[in-house]
C-alpha cells in the first residue's frame, strides 16, 4: 500500500513529511486505513489537532517495536499501513479530558484524547504520552501552525491545526546505529608499565580519600557496639565538671607548655579508654577487639591513634582556644621572664605601622614589572585566604581547618595563578617566600596569629608534626614572626618604608604638590630610582603612584610624577602597572575614573610614542576581571575612539558576552549617543578596510608579474567591494547571552552607523533574540521611533513576523505602549506602522482603507476583541468576534447576490464555540485577522471608485452594536424590497428571457473555466508552500550541520532545534488570495445558478398559463368555430390568449406584469328544475371555468414577481460579473506583488545565510 502510494501519478508531488502526505495528499483516501480518519476530519476538522513528528525522524528512524526484529520497519511506512499510528497522532482538542492550572507557575495542563482514545498531556510546550501508549515519552513541541488543505476531499479553504514535535508518540530509533565502542583516552608517551602505575596511583588516591573521610565520630555513629563500649567514658572525660582537668577550664594565667601538657594528659586518658575497652575482662571486650580489627580491614592504612587524637582535639577546641587567647592577650609586661613563647608580636599597632608596606621594599630579587604583578596577585589571594583565620565559623574553628588555610596560603604564594598567570615560570626561593609571607601576614591583619600557629604546632597529631613539608612551613612562619618582632633590627626599616609610602600616597590624594615636589626633588639627579623607593611602591592591589595620580584627577600631580625624571618610569613600568585584583591597567583606570582628558591624552601619547604596535594592541585589548578591555570603556572618553579604534579588538567578549562595539551601543544615557556609536562603527569599518587592503597587497606581492586591477586599486587605496576578502561586520560575533544583536540594542543613529546601508555588512534585520523578539518588535516595544523609521525603509524587513511562542505581532507590541511612553511619541509610531501597512499590504489605488491589527482576549466577556484602524482615523472601538459575525452576516444580507463571501465559508476554520489547545488561542485569532484583512483588501480591489467599500468599512468603524440584529435585518429586507419597487413596471418577453438565459449560459461557462484555473493555481500554490517548507528545513539542517562544532552532533540535536523548523512559506499566503478569488467566483456561480433556476421557473409558469388559456378558449368557443390559422399564430403570445378569453379576461397593465385577471363574475341565474341534466352540466362547466381563472391569476402573480426578480438579479449579476472580471485581475496582480516581495525577502535571507557560511569557510 505504501509503495503504491509513492509511485502513483494521480496525486500532487509527495510531501517530505509522510504523515501529512498520507492525510492530505492521498489518492486512496476512501480506503483503509485512511477512510475513517479522513471522514472524521472532513466533518469535524476544527475539533481535531494533528500531532506532526519531525519529517527527519519519519524518514530516517524506525519503529522501536521492531528493534529486535530482523525486518525493521521505518516510521514512514507506518503512515501508510498503520491506522493506529495515524489516529494516535490526531488529538480531540475540541473536548479535552481535563484542564488544570498549576498554582505557582500558572502553567496550563491539558489532557486530550487521541482519535483512538489514547491520552496525551500538553504542558509548558511539552507533550507527554499517557494512557494507551506502549511507551511513556516526553517530547518537545517545536512549533504550532495551520496547514492549508489543497485536496478535493476536504472542504475548500479548510485549515488544520498542527503541533510539530521532535519525534513520534511511538518513539523512534536511528536506522544506523554504531556498534563500535568509544576509544579510550591514551597518552602516547606512556608505556603499559606507566599505565599500570597510574592505575595503582589512582587506587591509592581513592583509598586515601576514603580514609580521610573517616572520623572517630563517624565510627561511633556507624558502630553501636563501639559507641556502647567507649561513648559514656568519653562523655565523662570531656564533661565540664571533670575536676581532673579543671585547670584547662579556669581563665587564669599559666604557661603555654602547661596547657600543652594538660592536653596530652587528656589524650592519654582517651587512648586508655580505647585500650580498656578491648580487654578480655571487660564486657564485650573481645567483640570490641574484633570490631576494631574489622574496621581496620574495611579501611586499609587507617591510623586509629590519629582518629582518636583528632576526636579529642575537636571536643577540646573551645577550651584550648580560649586558654590560648587569654594567655596571648595578657599584657606583655613580664612575658619575657614568665613565658616568652606567649609574647604577642603581631599587635594591632604593628599592623597599623606596617599597613602601607610595599613588596619592593623587602629586597625581593625579582624586579621585572610582570613578575611583580604576578607576586602582587599571589599576595592578594593569599591575604584573602589567610583572613579566614579571623572568622569564627565552624568551618575554620578546627585544627584541620587552620592547617588547611596555612597550606592554601603557602600554595597560593608558591604556585602560579590559576587564572591567566602573568609569570607562570616564576621560581620562588626561600628569601622571596619570606618577603611574600611578610606582605601576606602584615596585610591580612589576623588577630592572635601567634596563637593560631601555636595551636597547630602543639595540638596536631604526631604524623603531622613529623612531616617535613609541614615543619618547613611552620619554621618559615616562625622566622617571619621573628623578623617582625621588636628585637629585629630590620623592623624599623620596614616601618620607616611604610610611613614614607603613606606620606606619598596621602600627598597625591590630598593634592599636596609641595610634599610631592620635595620627594621628587630629593632624587631628581639620580639616574635611576632605588628599587626600594616610595615612588616605586605599590599597595596590596598592585596600584602605584601613577595610578593614585590618575585617581586624584590632577594634571599637575600626574606630570610632576611622570616627568620628574624620564628614567624613573620606563614604558614597561607604565604598561604593566595595574590593579591585580581587577586586572585594570592605567588607561582603564583613567577611563573608569573619568580622569581629565588632558591626563588621558598625555598618557595615551606616552604609550603611542614608546610602545610598538603589537604592544599597544596587547595593552588596549588586555581584559580585566570582568573580561572587558579598554574598548569596552571607550564611551567614557569618546575622543579616543578615533585615535586607537583601529587597534581595538572589537569582537572581544566580556563575561556578559558584550563586545566593545556592543557596549557602545548600550550606552543609552550618553549625551552624545549618535556621535559615540558613529565613531565606534567608523573605527570598525576603518579596521576592516585596512585588513582588506593588506590582503590585496599580499596578493600583489605574491602573485604574477602582471599587476592586476585589484592590485592597482589596493596600491592606490581604493576599496574593492567585490573582492573575495571584502567583508563587513560579523554580527554573529556581537550577540550577547540573550541573543540580542547590535541591531537590537542600538538606541538610535542607524543611518549614521551605516549598519543597514553598508553592503558588506552581513546582517539579518529579522533575526530574533532568545525571547523571540525581532529588532522591529523591540523598537516598537521600547518606543524607538528613529530606529523604526530606518528599519521600515529596509526591503529585507519581515513586517508581519510573529513571536513563535506567544504569537504576538508588531501591532500587539504597539498596543503595549499605551501608558508607558508619551502619547505623542506613541501616536507617531502608530502612524508610521499604519502607513507602512497600507503602502505595502493594501491596494495602492483603493480610496477606502481599513486594517485589522490585533486581537485581545477579554476575560470579563470571555470573547476576543479585534482592533481596527482606518487610513484617516486614529482610535476605533474594537469589535468582538460576536459583533464581527453580525457585521458579516448583515453585509451578506444586504448584498445577497454579490461575490461577498458567505458567512459560513468565512468562519469555516474559526469555530469560536469549539475549544482548542492553549497554544492555538492567539494563533487562531491571528489567522482570523489575516483572513479579515484579505476581505478588506478584496473589497477595496473589487469596489475601486465605488462607495460600497466605504459602506462595508463604516460598519466596522461605527459603534452601532446596541442596535439589535433582528431590527437591522428587517431594515435591510425593507430596503431590498424598496429597491425592487423602484424598478417600476417590468415587462419581459420570451425573447428577452431567452437573451438573459443565453447570457447566463455564456457566463456560466466562463466562470467555470476561470474557477477551474484558480482552483488549480491555488492547489499548486498551497502544495508549493509545503515544498518550500520542506526545502527550507532541509537546507537549514544542512547549514546547521556544516558548522564544524555541530557536524558530529547526535541525530537528536537536529530534531530538538526549534530554529531549524519552518512552518510557513511565501506561497502559502499567495494561495490564500487565490482561494479567495476562487471562493468569490463560486459565490457568483451560485448566483448564476439561482437566476437560472428562476428562469426555468418562469418558463414553467409561462407554459402553465399558456395551457390554462387554451383550456379557457375551448370552453368559450365551440370547437368548430375556433379559428385555426390565427389560433396557431397566437399560441406563443399570452396577450393573444388573454384577448381570446372573452369578457371574463382582459389585459390590465400593472407595475409588476403585463397581465392580470379582471374580476370574474359568474352569471347569477336561476336553474329551472325542468332543464335537468343540461343545468347540471352547465354548473359543472362554470365551476371548472372559475377554477381555471383563479389558477391562472395565481400563476400570473408568480410570474409578475419573477419578472422583477429576474430583471433585478440580471442587473446585479451583470454588474457583479463585470466587477469580478476587473477584481480578479486587480486582486491577482496585488497578491502576486505581495508574493514576489515576500519571496524576494526570503531569497535575500537565504543569500545572507549562504554568504555567512562562505565567510566562515574562508576564515576557518
UniProtKB/Swiss-Prot annotation:
Signal sequence region: none
UniProt cross-references to PROSITE patterns, sorted A to Z: VPS9
One GO BP: early endosome to late endosome transport
GO terms of molecular function: guanyl-nucleotide exchange factor activity; SNARE binding
Pfam family, one: VPS9
Cellular component GO terms held in the UniProt record: early endosome; late endosome; plasma membrane; transport vesicle; tubular endosome
InterPro entries the record matches: Ankyrin_rpt-contain_sf, UPF0507/Ank_repeat_27, VPS9, VPS9_dom_sf
Coiled-coil ranges from the UniProt annotation: none
All residue ranges annotated as the VPS9 domain in the record: 336-493
Family the entry assigns: Belongs to the UPF0507 family.
Name of the protein in its database record: UPF0507 protein LELG_01076
Species this protein is from: Lodderomyces elongisporus (strain ATCC 11503 / CBS 2605 / JCM 1781 / NBRC 1676 / NRRL YB-4239)
Amino acid at each position: 500500500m505504501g509503495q503504491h502510494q509513492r509511485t502513483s501519478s494521480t496525486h500532487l508531488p509527495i510531501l517530505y513529511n509522510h504523515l501529512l502526505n498520507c492525510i492530505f495528499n492521498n489518492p486512496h483516501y476512501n480506503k483503509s486505513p485512511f477512510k475513517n480518519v479522513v471522514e472524521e476530519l472532513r466533518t469535524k476538522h476544527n475539533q481535531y489537532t494533528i500531532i506532526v513528528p519531525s519529517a527527519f525522524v519519519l524518514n530516517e528512524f524506525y519503529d522501536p517495536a521492531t528493534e529486535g526484529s530482523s525486518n525493521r520497519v521505518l516510521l514512514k511506512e507506518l503512515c501508510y499501513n498503520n491506522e493506529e499510528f495515524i489516529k494516535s497522532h490526531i488529538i480531540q482538542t475540541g473536548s479535552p479530558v481535563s484542564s488544570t492550572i498549576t498554582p505557582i507557575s500558572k502553567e496550563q495542563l491539558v489532557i486530550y484524547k487521541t482519535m483512538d482514545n489514547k491520552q496525551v498531556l500538553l504542558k509548558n510546550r511539552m507533550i507527554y504520552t499517557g494512557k494507551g501508549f506502549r511507551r511513556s515519552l516526553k517530547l518537545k513541541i517545536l512549533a504550532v501552525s495551520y496547514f492549508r488543505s489543497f485536496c478535493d476531499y476536504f472542504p475548500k479553504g479548510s485549515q488544520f491545526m498542527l503541533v510539530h514535535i521532535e519525534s513520534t508518540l511511538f518513539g523512534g530509533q536511528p536506522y544506523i546505529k554504531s556498534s563500535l565502542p568509544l576509544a579510550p583516552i591514551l597518552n602516547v608517551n606512556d608505556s603499559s608499565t606507566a599505565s599500570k602505575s597510574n592505575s595503582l596511583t589512582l587506587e591509592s588516591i581513592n583509598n586515601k580519600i576514603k580514609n580521610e573521610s573517616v572520623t572517630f565520630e563517624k565510627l561511633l555513629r556507624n558502630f553501636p557496639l563501639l559507641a556502647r563500649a567507649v561513648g559514656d567514658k568519653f562523655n565523662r572525660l570531656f564533661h565540664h565538671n571533670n575536676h581532673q582537668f579543671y585547670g584547662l577550664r579556669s581563665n587564669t594565667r599559666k604557661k603555654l607548655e602547661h596547657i600543652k601538657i594538660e592536653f596530652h594528659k587528656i589524650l592519654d586518658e582517651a587512648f586508655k579508654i580505647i585500650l580498656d575497652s578491648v580487654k578480655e575482662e571487660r564486657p564485650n571486650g573481645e567483640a570490641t577487639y574484633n570490631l576494631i580489627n574489622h574496621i581496620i580491614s574495611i579501611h586499609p592504612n587507617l591510623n586509629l591513634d590519629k582518629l582518636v587524637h583528632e576526636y579529642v582535639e575537636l571536643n577540646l577546641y573551645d577550651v584550648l582556644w580560649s586558654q590560648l587567647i587569654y594567655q596571648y592577650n595578657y599584657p606583655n609586661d613580664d612575658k619575657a621572664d614568665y613565658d616568652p613563647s606567649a609574647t604577642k608580636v603581631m599587635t594591632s599597632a604593628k599592623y597599623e605601622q606596617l599597613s602601607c608596606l610595599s613588596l619592593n621594599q623587602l629586597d625581593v630579587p625579582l624586579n621585572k614589572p610582570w613578575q611583580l604583578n604576578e607576586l602582587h596577585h599571589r599576595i592578594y589571594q593569599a591575604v584573602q585566604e589567610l583572613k579566614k583565620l579571623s572568622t569564627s565559623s565552624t568551618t575554620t574553628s578546627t585544627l584541620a581547618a587552620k592547617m588547611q588555610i596555612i597550606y592554601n596560603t603557602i600554595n597560593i604564594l608558591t604556585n602560579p595563578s590559576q587564572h591567566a598567570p602573568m609569570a607562570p615560570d616564576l621560581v620562588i626561593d626561600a628569601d622571596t617566600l619570606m618577603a611574600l609571607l611578610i606582605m601576606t601576614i602584615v596585610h591580612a591583619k589576623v588577630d592572635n596569629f601567634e596563637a593560631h600557629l601555636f595551636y597547630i604546632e602543639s595540638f596536631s597529631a604526631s604524623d603531622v608534626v613529623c612531616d617535613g613539608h609541614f615543619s618547613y612551613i611552620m619554621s618559615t612562619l616562625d622566622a617571619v614572626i621573628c623578623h617582625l618582632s621588636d628585637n629585629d633590627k630590620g623592623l624599623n626599616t620596614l616601618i620607616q618604608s611604610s610611613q614614607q609610602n603613606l606620606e606619598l600616597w596621602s600627598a597625591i590624594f590630598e593634592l599636596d604638590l609641595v610634599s610631592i615636589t620635595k620627594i621628587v626633588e630629593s632624587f631628581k639627579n639620580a639616574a635611576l630610582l632605588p628599587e626600594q623607593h616610595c615612588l616605586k611602591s605599590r599597595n596590596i592591589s598592585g596600584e602605584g603612584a601613577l595610578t593614585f595620580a590618575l585617581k586624584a584627577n590632577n594634571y599637575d600631580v600626574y606630570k610632576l610624577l611622570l616627568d620628574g625624571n624620564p628614567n624613573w618610569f620606563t614604558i614597561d613600568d607604565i604598561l604593566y602597572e595595574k590593579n591585580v585584583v581587577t586586572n585594570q591597567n592605567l588607561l582603564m583606570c583613567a577611563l573608569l575614573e573619568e580622569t581629565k582628558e588632558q591626563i588621558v591624552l598625555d598618557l595615551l601619547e606616552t604609550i603611542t610614542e614608546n610602545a610598538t604596535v603589537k604592544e599597544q594592541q596587547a595593552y588596549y585589548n588586555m581584559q580585566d576581571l570582568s573580561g572587558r578591555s579598554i574598548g569596552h570603556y571607550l564611551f567614557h572618553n569618546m575622543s579616543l575612539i578615533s585615535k586607537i579604534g583601529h587597534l581595538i579588538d572589537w569582537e572581544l567578549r566580556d563575561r556578559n558576552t558584550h563586545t566593545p562595539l556592543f557596549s557602545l551601543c548600550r550606552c543609552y544615557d550618553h549625551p552624545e549617543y549618535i556621535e559615540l556609536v558613529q565613531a565606534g562603527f567608523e573605527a570598525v569599518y576603518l579596521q576592516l578596510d585596512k585588513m582588506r587592503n593588506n590582503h590585496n597587497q599580499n596578493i600583489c606581492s605574491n602573485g604574477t608579474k602582471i599587476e592586476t586591477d585589484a592590485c592597482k586599486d589596493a596600491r592606490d587605496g581604493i576599496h574593492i567591494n567585490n573582492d573575495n576578502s571584502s567583508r563587513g561586520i560579523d554580527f554573529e560575533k556581537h550577540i550577547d547571552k540573550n541573543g540580542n544583536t547590535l541591531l537590537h540594542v542600538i538606541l538610535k543613529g542607524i543611518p549614521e552607523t551605516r549598519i543597514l546601508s553598508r553592503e558588506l555588512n552581513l546582517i539579518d534585520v529579522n533575526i530574533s533574540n532568545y525571547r523571540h523578539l525581532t529588532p522591529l518588535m523591540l523598537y516598537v516595544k521600547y518606543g524607538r521611533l528613529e530606529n523604526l523609521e530606518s528599519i521600515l525603509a529596509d526591503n529585507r524587513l519581515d513586517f508581519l513576523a510573529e513571536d513563535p511562542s506567544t504569537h504576538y505581532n508588531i501591532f500587539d507590541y504597539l498596543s503595549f505602549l499605551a501608558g508607558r511612553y508619551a502619547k505623542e511619541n506613541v501616536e507617531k509610531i502608530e502612524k508610521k506602522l499604519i502607513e507602512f501597512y497600507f503602502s505595502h499590504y493594501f491596494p495602492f489605488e483603493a480610496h477606502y482603507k481599513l486594517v485589522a491589527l490585533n486581537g485581545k482576549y477579554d476575560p470579563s466577556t470571555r470573547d476576543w476583541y479585534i482592533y481596527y484602524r482606518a487610513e484617516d482615523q486614529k482610535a476605533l472601538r474594537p469589535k468582538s468576534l460576536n459583533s464581527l459575525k453580525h457585521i458579516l452576516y448583515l453585509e451578506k444580507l444586504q448584498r445577497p447576490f454579490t461575490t461577498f463571501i458567505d458567512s459560513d465559508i468565512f468562519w469555516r476554520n474559526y469555530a469560536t464555540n469549539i475549544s482548542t489547545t492553549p497554544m492555538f488561542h492567539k494563533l487562531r485569532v491571528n489567522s482570523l485577522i489575516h483572513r479579515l484583512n484579505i476581505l478588506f483588501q478584496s473589497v477595496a480591489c473589487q469596489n475601486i471608485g465605488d462607495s460600497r467599500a466605504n459602506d462595508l468599512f463604516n460598519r466596522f468603524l461605527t459603534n452601532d452594536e446596541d442596535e439589535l440584529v433582528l431590527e437591522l435585518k428587517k431594515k435591510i429586507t425593507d430596503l431590498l424590497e424598496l429597491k425592487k419597487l423602484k424598478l417600476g413596471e417590468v415587462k419581459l418577453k420570451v425573447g428577452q428571457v431567452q437573451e438573459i438565459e443565453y447570457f447566463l449560459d455564456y457566463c456560466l461557462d466562463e466562470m467555470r473555466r476561470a474557477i477551474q484555473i484558480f482552483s488549480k493555481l491555488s492547489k499548486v500554490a498551497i502544495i508549493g508552500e509545503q515544498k518550500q517548507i520542506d526545502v527550507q528545513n532541509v537546507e537549514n539542517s544542512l547549514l546547521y550541520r556544516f558548522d564544524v562544532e555541530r557536524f558530529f552532533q547526535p541525530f537528536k540535536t537536529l530534531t530538538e532545534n526549534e530554529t531549524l523548523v519552518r512552518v510557513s512559506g511565501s506561497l502559502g499566503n499567495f494561495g490564500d488570495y487565490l482561494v479567495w478569488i476562487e471562493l468569490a467566483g463560486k459565490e457568483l456561480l451560485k448566483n448564476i445558478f439561482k437566476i437560472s433556476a428562476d428562469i426555468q421557473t418562469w418558463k414553467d409558469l409561462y407554459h402553465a398559463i399558456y395551457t390554462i388559456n387554451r383550456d379557457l378558449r375551448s370552453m368559450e368557443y365551440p370547437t368548430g368555430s375556433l379559428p385555426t390559422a390565427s389560433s396557431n399564430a397566437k399560441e406563443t403570445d399570452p396577450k393573444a390568449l388573454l384577448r381570446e378569453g372573452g369578457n371574463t379576461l382582459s389585459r390590465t397593465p400593472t407595475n409588476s406584469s403585463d397581465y392580470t385577471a379582471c374580476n370574474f363574475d359568474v352569471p347569477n341565474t336561476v336553474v329551472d328544475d325542468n332543464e335537468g341534466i343540461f343545468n347540471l352540466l352547465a354548473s359543472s362547466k362554470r365551476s371548472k371555468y372559475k377554477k381555471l381563472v383563479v389558477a391562472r391569476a395565481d400563476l400570473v402573480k408568480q410570474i409578475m414577481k419573477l419578472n422583477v426578480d429576474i430583471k433585478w438579479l440580471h442587473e446585479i449579476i451583470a454588474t457583479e460579473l463585470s466587477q469580478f472580471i476587473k477584481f480578479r485581475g486587480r486582486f491577482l496582480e496585488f497578491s502576486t506583488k505581495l508574493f514576489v516581495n515576500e519571496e524576494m525577502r526570503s531569497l535575500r535571507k537565504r543569500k545572507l545565510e549562504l554568504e555567512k557560511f562562505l565567510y566562515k569557510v574562508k576564515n576557518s
